[in-house]
């Protein structure tokens, strides 16, 4: 409670409104901004969001008269309702302008002698419920063997809209609604164009099994447990990294580079998520970035400008307090790799650590990105360990037992702690397509590469239409044909589709 009240403005009316609705001003401002987007005056000047009073979220009659647009609260945030069964959306859901509505009524009216548009559709509470992972807070007993909230139990799956980013749809419909009813024109305002673009494209790869059989422990396990031929192991060890059966990185980086070159600089990023040794049975094989094999992989990744992040182990997923330790180890190993790559670490006078003139290396060593192994990001409050560690971007937002949009959006959103209703600085990046789910026929119902390709193209088109961030998650070992016959081929076909359909070639 203290963290919330510290963020409440000192204005007496806003303070009263806060205690009545129990939603802080900065959180409300963020949610309105998420739905409406940047606003401009007719002369082209951008209107700061903190001064944007076109839309009010209130049921106070006096407040309503002072606004041009009012979204009427449904009571979701009230103290006697929030966190209780009475706050859950009731199925079947009503629809507002063709979009499932979690809270409120799908209707509007003009009040205040036609000067105020009153929306009874509570888009604020509906959006909050989805992007804050609210139901994971209230359904603590529903977890799988890795501590994950099952997608099959989620409202989007039960209500049948998991394949739709309905928060993005709320935004598109609301913006159209404001323009159609002349609200913006009467106020001398314009909205920034939205949709029909990718804000970013993230090509992400988890390095879970980068090699076939390397390291003393893995060699003994391969010989005595998997019954590998010792001479075959020796031949692979004595060959170059590219001859390892699990070395799929050249083809991955080549495909990623083709998409990177098809868009303006900075629009597309290739990202590798790497873990540190943990001892957990699911975190095998263990590897270190400082080994010659991993060094070769990172040196090739650096050539295409790939960025790096921490793949939190299954151990730290179960014990989040270990995340800072893993991040520290990974950062130290990555520093050693860069020292070998560039020979750049030089102790600065009166400084206790090293610096790099190259800005990319410095940013990489900050390691502000993370993903959890098997997407096993447990309770919503576990996210605070990421924040404490210095992580500012997490890429774990998808279900492992369902395709679709876990947060109800294709856009990155700031994490909201549903326990405290606190708006944080951690950005949650929804995964648009996850190869590990696509290959599970029982979940995806995709029986061939062509079926999967058509589905993936539909998702890509949908994210583009909503103006979202397209994030692909393709584990590197899945490119090995022995692991799966066509998921690697699907990735290359999909990237080719993205480049040819949406690529914006830079002028030569």
Task: Label each PLM-derived region with a short phrase.
Residues 2-289, 348-357, 400, 407-412, ...:
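Terminal accessory/targeting
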Residues 205, 274, 310-313, 368-375, ...:
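Short His-Asn-centered micro-motif
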Residues 223-229, 289-310, 336-340, 390-400:
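Acidic, His- and aromatic-enriched active-site or binding-groove loops in soluble protein domains
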Residues 249-257, 291-303, 326, 378-388, ...:
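Histidine/acidic residue-rich metal-binding segments in metalloenzymes
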Residues 257-264, 321-380, 384-385, 391-393, ...:
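CE4/NodB-like, metal-dependent polysaccharide N-deacetylase domain
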Residues 271-273, 284-334:
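Acidic, glycine-rich loop-and-beta core segments that form the ion-binding/anion-interacting portion
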Residues 319-327, 379-385, 405-410, 482-492:
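Histidine/acidic-residue-rich catalytic or RNA/ligand-binding cores of hydrolases
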Residues 372, 376-385, 390-392, 396-409, ...:
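A structural motif corresponding to the C-terminal lobe/cap of the Radical SAM core domain
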């Amino acid at each position: 409670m203290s963290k919330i009240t510290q963020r409440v403005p000192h204005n007496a009316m806003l303070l009263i409104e806060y205690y009545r609705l129990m939603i802080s001003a900065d959180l409300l401002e963020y949610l309105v901004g998420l739905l409406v987007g940047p606003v401009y005056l007719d002369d082209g000047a951008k209107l700061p969001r903190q001064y944007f009073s076109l839309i009010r979220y209130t049921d106070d009659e006096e407040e309503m008269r002072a606004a041009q647009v009012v979204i009427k609260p449904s009571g979701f945030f009230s103290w006697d309702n929030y966190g209780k069964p009475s706050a859950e959306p009731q199925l079947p859901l009503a629809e507002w302008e063709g979009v499932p509505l979690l809270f409120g009524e799908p209707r509007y009216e003009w009040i205040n002698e036609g000067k105020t548009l009153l929306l009874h559709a509570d888009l604020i509470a509906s959006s909050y419920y989805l992007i804050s992972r609210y139901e994971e807070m209230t359904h603590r007993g529903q977890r799988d063997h890795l501590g994950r909230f099952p997608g099959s139990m989620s409202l989007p799956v039960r209500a049948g809209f998991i394949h739709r980013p309905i928060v993005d749809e709320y935004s598109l419909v609301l913006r159209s609604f404001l323009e159609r009813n002349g609200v913006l024109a009467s106020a001398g305002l314009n909205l920034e164009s939205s949709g029909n673009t990718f804000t970013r494209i993230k090509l992400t790869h988890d390095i879970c099994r980068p090699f076939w059989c390397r390291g003393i422990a893995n060699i003994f396990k391969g010989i005595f447990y998997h019954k590998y031929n010792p001479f075959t192991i020796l031949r692979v060890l004595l060959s170059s990294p590219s001859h390892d059966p699990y070395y799929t990185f050249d083809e991955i980086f080549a495909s990623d580079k083709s998409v990177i070159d098809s868009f303006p600089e900075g629009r597309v990023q290739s990202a590798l998520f790497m873990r540190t040794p943990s001892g957990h049975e699911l975190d095998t094989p263990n590897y270190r970035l400082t080994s010659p094999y991993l060094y070769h992989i990172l040196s090739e990744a650096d050539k295409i400008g790939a960025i790096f992040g921490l793949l939190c182990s299954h151990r730290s997923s179960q014990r989040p307090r270990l995340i800072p330790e893993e991040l520290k180890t990974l950062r130290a190993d990555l520093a050693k790799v860069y020292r070998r790559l560039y020979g750049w670490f030089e102790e600065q006078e009166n400084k206790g650590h090293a610096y790099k003139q190259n800005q990319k290396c410095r940013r990489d060593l900050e390691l502000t990105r993370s993903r959890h192994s098997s997407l096993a990001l447990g309770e919503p409050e576990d996210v605070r360990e990421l924040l404490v560690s210095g992580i500012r971007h997490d890429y774990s937002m998808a279900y492992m037992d369902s395709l679709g949009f876990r947060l109800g959006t294709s856009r990155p959103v700031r994490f909201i702690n549903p326990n405290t209703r606190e708006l944080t600085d951690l950005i949650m990046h929804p995964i648009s397509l996850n190869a590990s789910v696509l290959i599970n026929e029982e979940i995806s119902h995709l029986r061939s590469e062509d079926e999967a390709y058509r589905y993936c193209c539909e998702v890509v088109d949908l994210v583009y239409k909503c103006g979202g961030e397209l994030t692909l998650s393709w584990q590197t070992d899945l490119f090995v044909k022995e692991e799966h016959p066509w998921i690697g081929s699907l990735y290359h076909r999909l990237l080719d589709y993205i480049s040819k359909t949406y690529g914006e070639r830079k002028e030569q």
